Amino acid sequence: MFCDKTNVNILTSILLQSGITDAVVCPGSRNGVIVHNLHELTRTASPEHPFRIHAVTDERSAAFVALGISLAQDLRPVAVCVTSGSALLNTIPAVAEAFYRQIPLLVISADRPPQLIGQLDGQTIPQTSALAPYAKTYTLAEPHTEAEVHWCRNAACEACIALKRRGGGPVHLNVPLSEPLFSFTTPRLPSASPVAFYETEDGAPPAALVSKISEATLPVVIVGQCERKADILERLDEENKLLVLPELVSNQANAHRTALLESSPELREQLRPDLLIHVGGNLVGKQLKLALRQRPALSVVRIQQNAGMPDTFMHLDMLVEAPWQNLLARLRPLLREKPAVCRLRQQLDNAPYAIPAADIQHTAMTAIKRHLQQHRLPLSAIHLANSTVVRSAAAVFNDGTFTLRVNRGVNGIEGSLSAAAGNALASRKTVLAFIGDLSFFYDQNALWNSALRGNLRIVLFNNSGGRIFKHLPGLNDSPASNSYIAGAHHTSARGVAETHRLEYLSAGSPDDLPSAINRLLTHEAERPVLLEIFC
């Protein structure tokens, strides 16, 4: 029987399936349940995939013993399991050695519940990052919900992947455990499948990925934030090999599809992919992401060059570390047309787009886009501030015609205007910034720069507070919502414009827009031009 600690059983299952066959174990009470499970593996593992444990009393020696076992097995990952407190610190010499020699040493430490840290409890120290900078810590918190079980499994998977990533190295897995500890009535381990990991510097597609796509009925590519266009996506899309769903901030063609899916529950219901390939950075839309998380039979492949293991759609089963554009280009000749892709692509491209309820913000963006297209103004980029502005832009700038820049790495309101100012300083072309009032006043120091020129044009939507807060269910029930949470105010940007010698324009109704937009986009100016639109 295995122990009754869910996080320990998930860890045990992932270790067994990740190719770890040896563990060095040290004495201790808090890690006793982990050692029990590892011992059970020696009894229940198959003859084809045996599991061995090695008892060593001294933790400093034990970690080096594990290192030696790894060396003897052609750098196969080996675990060392220690109890809480100073026992973990004793592994540092071996961990440092493993770091500099790129030896995949997995240090598994039992830990006390986090609320006991700093309470003068025995063998209780802050163990997260205790082995830094030599080993990154992954924590397997005790899960109490289905979602927490999922993230616990992910942490164990990511730790095992980190052992092999970029030549290999040491990793720290910290396992907090509350009392009671010693109950062993679980007959079998959970079916916690590991995330398959492939690393390819030249973008050669793994055979397992080719098979996945070949077997899929409706393979979909969701493209998050990108800074430049990827032509390979259009080719795959035109050939109906993959259904490409780019986000607004991806700077790809066909972002109107994602905008449609965000706004239409009926279309989201019809989108039932069996394989999702996820590339690019952050996503703006929420509804499509939530719908895909609820698809029970969805398989997700993440392709990226950087470290980490984002499981945005909560169905990740393969991680490929590679330049995704190169990989998709090399995949293309290996794939065939998919009838389901063709059908859904046509449906999305022919579906009528529900124009948002006419407001001055949407009207202004539409008019500005029309003016830019008609007059072919040399434009470096359009910068979008976060919150309402970027969501409104999804209904207008979704055809990949313009280069869009958004601070979606963290999604904060700070720095939107500063990033646009930096772009304008480095370019001779026009930089256009759309921004809301809170973001503007928060970042107004971006304009405190005498080097800024007239190629920076700013459209400020002033609705006297954070409009996005009005769309949060239940928040309006709070008497603090308007003044204290949404940042309600009665401020105009006219004074800011005068202070920094900007040309100031304003519009208070749709009738004011045509002349104001025409001057904003055509007037020669030595300093930035600001159009404030009162919503």
Q: Where do the protein language model's features map onto the residues?
A:
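Active-site diphosphate/adenylate-binding microenvironment
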Residues: V8-L11, L16-G19, S29-R30, I34-L38, ...
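N-terminal cofactor/phosphate-binding cores enriched in small/glycine residues
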Residues: D4-A96
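Conformationally flexible catalytic loops at phosphate/diphosphate-handling active centers
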Residues: E48-P50, A155-E158, A162-E215
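Thiamine diphosphate
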Residues: I108, P113-T128, S392-C535
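Phosphate/pyrophosphate-binding active-site segments
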Residues: M1-F2, A291-T388, S492-V496, A507-C535
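Glycine-rich, acidic loop regions that bind phosphate or pyrophosphate groups
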Residues: S109-A159, P246-Q346, S450, I458, ...
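A short, small-residue-rich loop immediately preceding and capping a beta-strand
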Residues: T21-V24, F51-I53, A72-R112, R272-G280, ...
